[in-house]
Amino acid sequence: MEASVILPILKKKLAFLSGGKDRRSGLILTIPLCLEQTNMDELSVTLDYLLSIPSEKCKARGFTVIVDGRKSQWNVVKTVVVMLQNVVPAEVSLVCVVKPDEFWDKKVTHFCFWKEKDRLGFEVILVSANKLTRYIEPCQLTEDFGGSLTYDHMDWLNKRLVFEKFTKESTSLLDELALINNGSDKGNQQEKERSVDLNFLPSVDPETVLQTGHELLSELQQRRFNGSDGGVSWSPMDDELLAQPQVMKLLDSLREQYTRYQEVCRQRSKRTQLEEIQQKVMQVVNWLEGPGSEQLRAQWGIGDSIRASQALQQKHEEIESQHSEWFAVYVELNQQIAALLNAGDEEDLVELKSLQQQLSDVCYRQASQLEFRQNLLQAALEFHGVAQDLSQQLDGLLGMLCVDVAPADGASIQQTLKLLEEKLKSVDVGLQGLREKGQGLLDQISNQASWAYGKDVTIENKENVDHIQGVMEDMQLRKQRCEDMVDVRRLKMLQMVQLFKCEEDAAQAVEWLSELLDALLKTHIRLGDDAQETKVLLEKHRKFVDVAQSTYDYGRQLLQATVVLCQSLRCTSRSSGDTLPRLNRVWKQFTIASEERVHRLEMAIAFHSNAEKILQDCPEEPEAINDEEQFDEIEAVGKSLLDRLTVPVVYPDGTEQYFGSPSDMASTAENIRDRMKLVNLKRQQLRHPEMVTTES
């Protein structure tokens, strides 16, 4: 009986072998009755199956049956006990009926068991769950009865199913393997061939069965001890229940038969494989030396452009694709031959090595030719790519040189010059790269004759060489023309830089001169408090005028230079119509203001000098001091100077400009008036000396 047949019944857990043992090493059979009515037929089937598992030796030690009646009725318990007598009378040595806390009528139950004792053939005792340890050790009881033994019914059932499946499959597989192996050991070659066709493959995979067996054996060996706290807990999957030696014996037999089966398969496979290898080797060799070589002989050009080279590459890839299929066959054949050589059969070694050498020579030669052709086309594609990039760079540079631009300022000219230099440098780098690519391609072409298969490729090579050299020479000429044009443009740009610089500096000179004029009118307003200070101011003013004169002369020189540069560049000077009039206008204004400033300072010097002579006490010159004309002259100069301070500077265009602010002019005028008052006071003293004496 197999567990898979009665699986639904076994899942109900009507009875089970927990793996625990009594004090006589007899197995403990547990029947957990429940509130629901127990199906006695199913219980009987379950008991039959469970009692078929242990070995005869184990059965001889007898069973201790625990009937858990705590959730059942007495009549059910009695029926089960009686059924045990019918099912396993010889194997049962003790039946422990676990009673509930509120048990049935003790007299009735005691009377009934005592009455049936001789007929049952085994001892039946009624015991509470907590008193079971009097008959069975706690470590052999499950947790339901207060013990420490762990039992998982579904786990046990699953392992049991695996065990039975393995036993069934391994037994069937052993028969099949024995039939195959025995058929291979006897009979003639024809019978062997026939046996290969009919019985060569077993119904199940031996590897799978062996793996299942090893996993099962490992599980059995590991589950023998799974206790805790130093106690030993016997699992229901130990060697006494599931016959661990039986699994080991089946595995040993399977390994032996499977090893023989593998050898039979290897020998048969080797014979068939050798014939297939010979046939495939000749197919590969014949194709590579025939159609494959013809395809390569027809391809020698490199193309005259990127598109042409790409088309040739695409054609070559198609050829490589066809070859790759045969190379894949070669790799597979080489692996097969190597495997057969490693087998070490002397009778096949010479033939296999010869086939391997012939195949390798042809394939490597053809692969080298394909690689050479691919490298040549790749080099040609790179050469044409560099040539195209260089041509585009030259076109861009030439287009830039052919456009006559009018830069707005020197910065844009510098940027244009920098861009030209960068483009020219990029062209130099591109041309150098083209030469390197071209020389590498020429070197490869010179080696092309070695792969010619006897074909004269002189014409094809000459066309390729002429094309490469022609491209490089053409690029060199175009680059030289661009360099010449760049030199011309560079000279023109530098002249334009000078032109803009002169214009900028001339405009700056106008600004400086305007600033000097502004400073003259706003800050150069003092006339001095005495003659000495006024003379110092006049000297400073002359130096100030020298600076302005230098600035004006510098601006004129710059504008003259712009005229010369414009004539050289054949362009209209912007400065001659704008900057020069402004420069002359500002200079004219500065000249007028400067002359007015000089005139005022000279008048101030004359005024202060005469005033100081009168105001100083000079007894050596009494006649001079008493000269009324001098007083009149001083007074006239002072008044004239005061009037001059109120007069603005008038420019040629009619505009007027005052020196300083009104407060500045008032301060200067007040100083002059004070000096005039002192002179008048001195005059009065000289006219009426007695007034001075009386006052003193």
From Swiss-Prot:
Q: Which GO terms describe its molecular function?
A: phosphatidic acid binding; phosphatidylinositol-3,4-bisphosphate binding; phosphatidylinositol-3,5-bisphosphate binding; phosphatidylinositol-3-phosphate binding; phosphatidylinositol-4,5-bisphosphate binding; phosphatidylinositol-4-phosphate binding; phosphatidylinositol-5-phosphate binding
Statement: the UniProt record of this protein carries the keyword Chloroplast: no
Q: What is an annotated GO biological process for this record, any one?
A: negative regulation of calcium ion transmembrane transport via high voltage-gated calcium channel
Q: Which PROSITE patterns match?
A: CRAL_TRIO (PS50191)
A GO CC annotation given for this chain: intermediate filament cytoskeleton
Question: Where are Spectrin repeat segments found?
Answer: 275-378, 381-494, 500-602
Q: Where is it expressed, tissue-wise?
A: Broad expression. High expression in thalamus and brain. Significantly expressed in vasculature.
Keywords recorded for this protein, A-Z = Repeat
**All residue ranges annotated as the CRAL-TRIO domain in the record:** 1-153
The record, for Gene3D superfamilies, names: 1.20.58.60
Write down the superkingdom of origin. Eukaryota
Q: What is said about its interaction partners and assembly?
A: Interacts (via the spectrin 1 repeat) with TRPC4 and TRPC5 (via CIRB domain). Interacts with CTNNB1.
The misc remark on file is:
Called SOLO because the encoded protein is related to but shorter than DUO and TRIO.
Indicate the family of this protein: Belongs to the SOLO family.
Per its database record, what is this protein's job? May act as the primary docking protein directing membrane turnover and assembly of the transient receptor potential channels TRPC4 and TRPC5. Binds phospholipids such as phosphatidylinositol monophosphates, phosphatidylinositol diphosphates (PIP2s) and phosphatidic acid, but not less polar lipids including phosphatidylcholine, phosphatidylserine, and phosphatidylinositol. The binding to PIP2s is calcium dependent. Might be involved in the plasma membrane localization of CTNNB1.
Q: What is this protein called?
A: SEC14 domain and spectrin repeat-containing protein 1
Q: Which organism is it from?
A: Homo sapiens (Human)
